[in-house]
Each structure stands twice: as C-alpha cells, then as structure tokens.
Amino acid sequence: MKIKKAVFPVAGMGTRFLPATKASPKEMLPVVDKPLIQYAVEEALAAGIKEMVFVTGRSKRSIEDHFDKAYELETELERRGKHEMLEYVRTLMPADMKCVFIRQAEALGLGHAVLCAQPVVGNEPFAVLLADDLLDGEPAVMRQMVDVYDYYKCSVLGVQQVPREDTRSYGIVASKPLKEDLEAVHAIVEKPKPEDAPSTLAVVGRYVLTPRIFHHLAHLGKGAGGEIQLTDGIAALMAEEQVLAYRYHGKRYDCGSKIGYLEATLAMARKHPEVGQQFEQLLLTEAARIQPREVLPTMLETTA
C-alpha cells in the first residue's frame, strides 16, 4: 500500500522561542520567507503524499489559516498587478492536496499526538514529519524514506549520528547493518544518558510507520517525561514487525534550538533565488567587522 498521508504533530508549546511563540506556533516561525511547517509540507508533497493531517493544540489557528484560501490577499495582489506573487500564493496548497486538522486535547507527548491521527489515517501506512527538523535533501528526505518503505514494506526511521553527549536529547537505536545507509533496528531507547546509550545513531523527526503502531500506542502507559512516547510504541512494534533505520542523504537543521534555527535561516537565505547573492555579500561584510571575543582564547585553552 502506498504512503498517502502525512501526520504533522504541531501541538507543542515552543517555549524555547518565547516570547515569539507566546501567541504564534513555533511551526510558523519563518525561515527567510516560508514558515517551518511549509518546508515540512513541501517535503511530504515531494514524496507524493497528498493528504496532510495536522495534530494541533491551542493557539495553532494560524497554521490552518496558512493552508487555507486567502481571497482578500489574492484580490489585492491582482489589483496591484503582482501576478507572480499571486500565482505563488495560489499554488501554496495544490488543488489535489487535502488538509485535516485534529485537536490534541492534552499535551501527552509525541506518541499521543500520533495516536490522535488514527481516525483519519485508518489502517494505512503513513509518514510523520516534525517541522522542528528542517531537512534539506535531494531528493527530498521523505521521498527517500518512502522509496525504502515501498521496497521493504515495513516501518522506516530517519536517523543520523550524533555526539555521544547529545544522546539524552534523542531516541537512540541499536541496529545491525543491512546495506549501505540502511540498518535493522533491534532496540530503541528514549533519551538515554550518554553512558547508557546503545549507540550514537539518533532518530530525527522523520518516520514512515505501519498502522500497527496505533495498537501499541493505545496500550502504552506514560514513559519518559510522563508522556506517551512514540519511541516506546516503536519498541513494542519491533516485537512483531521489522523496523529499519535509514541514514538519509541531506542536511538537518534543528530548528527547535535557536542556533539550529539561525543556521537554517543562514543556509536557506544563501540558496534563495531572490536574495541569496546579496545575502552572501552581507555575510562577508559582517564577517569582516567581527572582532574576536576576549573569552575566546580562554575557551580554546580549556578545550585544547
């Protein structure tokens, strides 16, 4: 069965970006001229997925508005003769793309958010994309993962190597190589301490899951952080189905952190067809003005 639906858990509070996220979802933070959620949706579209399922919380209405028709804006752009921008706005949501919005009544974790999508997803395999992770790949990372699913017909986790000291921030897999860039997962642990981590292969915000995951999520108790963890559901799923870890081809920007968000903005601005060249010149100009901070030699001595 083909992957036709993508789930976007967008109910998080975004506290690391306060006050910017006090009244606006973190998924609507712009990277140059597109919000994070649009990058994720475009990645799903590039994978041939047409039905987008957004699991939302309070103060998330702007996501729904973003993917809705904007008649007043279109009329104004047409009046001003801005036909190129008008066409761009009109194609923001392709005619064959469907959006469904589901409210997550309680913030009970990523696993619970995915479980909330079951009434819409039904008994089909599906993708999960976390907009916090902006993945820049060619072809699109979700396209790569769907291709893996189409061949093996089992759940696929997007993974990358991380420093051991960072394992406490990720779900970490233990696995055995199958072929280049693909591994068979035999264990997965949510946010282990560095000394307890089975490896440094971390799951990032991309998943292709079989519908059997819903059964396991529905029977889970609360795990790490007092939440229903998707990682725990995947661990239970492995007892009856194969789960693969795929080392995707592309660059990940962790836009859940301020530095990662700034890095993504810098990278996307440099690639932008309208402002890229000017932005690179601006970077060179600003770099020439930067003076070494007094604390830098001390930091270098400490790490030497």
Annotate each predicted stretch with a short phrase.
Residues 2-79, 140-144:
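N-terminal glycine-rich phosphate-binding loop and ensuing alpha1 helix
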Residues 5, 50-52, 98, 125, ...:
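Residues at the starts of beta-strands that form the adenosine-phosphate
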Residues 28, 99-101, 155, 243-245, ...:
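Conserved beta-strand scaffold positions in the cores of enzyme catalytic domains, especially
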Residues 73-76, 89-175, 209-211, 217-220:
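Conserved beta-loop-beta/alpha segment of the NTase-like Rossmann-fold superfamily
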Residues 127, 146-150, 177-281:
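Catalytic-core segments of class I nucleotidyltransferases/pyrophosphorylases
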Residues 270, 276-295, 299-302:
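Catalytic, metal-anchored helix/loop core of enzyme active sites in primary metabolism
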